[in-house]
């Protein structure tokens, strides 16, 4: 995707032919005749619903029509994260590998990973300079919630030099972008697969309601898309 993931979701939206409502608040799902009523900006009844939302959100929406499944979903915990995107004038000294993962507990390093984007994707390298993405936030810490943008950028530059030897300040920092993801990463504990199986088994008794998402399938676009396709086909 030469212009980012927006190419993917814009193409999917166009190809779907569906009516898509953006910023449409939904407060609850209840029985409505032979279907399900979605309460929000409009009270609308649907034959089938696929919930593609984080587990805690699904728990809130299902508490009336599937309380046991909702209770199971409440056990899925989430982690917050923050991403710092940086563009440098020069890529001299940047390692040739695609990225770096930082072990939990590493001393004097707050970042958990770096993606050396201009090394990983050739079309980004064509733009010149260097593009690097630093990731922060692990389960149980609050960096993504409490750190200022200035702190995140400083840590990203410091940690990048510590981990790779690349001095971003000397390379010429030209652009910065900070994105926070609140509750964006589900925590997969040793009981997680059993939880997913239990939720889906309980929802089998509620004909017309299905569920998908990163908490159920695993993080990453390929895993999420594959699971969503399976769920969608079950409704056909």
Q: What are the language-model segments listed below?
A:
Residues 16, 46-47, 206:
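Short, well-ordered alpha-helix to beta-strand connector turns
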Residues 20-22, 51, 211:
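A structural signal for the hydrophobic beta-strands that form the central parallel beta-sheet
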Residues 9-14, 63-66, 153-161:
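Generic solvent-exposed, charged/amphipathic alpha-helical segments
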Residues 15-27:
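A conserved beta-strand/loop element that lines the FAD pocket in flavoprotein oxidoreductases
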Residues 114-236:
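Conserved flavin/dinucleotide-binding core of flavoenzymes
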Residues 24-146, 150, 163:
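Mid-domain catalytic core of redox enzymes
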Residues 1-13, 21, 145-152:
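Short beta-strand to alpha-helix junction loop
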């Amino acid at each position: 995707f030469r212009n980012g993931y927006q190419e993917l979701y814009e193409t999917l939206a166009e190809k779907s032919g569906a009516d898509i409502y953006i910023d449409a608040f939904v407060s609850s799902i209840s029985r409505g005749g032979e279907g399900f009523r979605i309460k929000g900006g409009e009270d609308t009844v649907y034959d089938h619903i696929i919930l593609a939302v984080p587990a805690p959100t699904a728990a809130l929406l299902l508490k009336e029509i599937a309380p046991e499944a909702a209770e199971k979903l409440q056990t899925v915990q989430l982690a917050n994260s923050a991403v710092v995107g940086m563009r440098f004038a020069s890529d001299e000294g940047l390692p040739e590998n695609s990225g770096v993962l930082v072990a939990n507990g590493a001393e004097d390093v707050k970042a958990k990973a770096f993606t050396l984007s201009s090394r990983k994707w050739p079309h980004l390298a064509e733009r010149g300079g260097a593009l690097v993405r630093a990731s922060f936030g692990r389960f149980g810490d609050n960096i993504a919630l409490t750190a200022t943008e200035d702190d995140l950028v400083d840590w990203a530059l410091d940690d990048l030099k510590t981990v790779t030897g690349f001095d971003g300040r000397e390379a010429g920092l030209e652009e910065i972008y900070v994105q926070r993801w609140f509750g964006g990463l589900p925590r997969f504990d040793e009981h997680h697969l059993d939880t997913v199986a239990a939720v889906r088994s309980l929802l089998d008794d509620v004909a017309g309601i299905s569920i998908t998402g990163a908490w159920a399938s695993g993080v990453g676009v390929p895993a999420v898309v594959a699971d969503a396709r399976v769920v969608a086909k079950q409704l056909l």
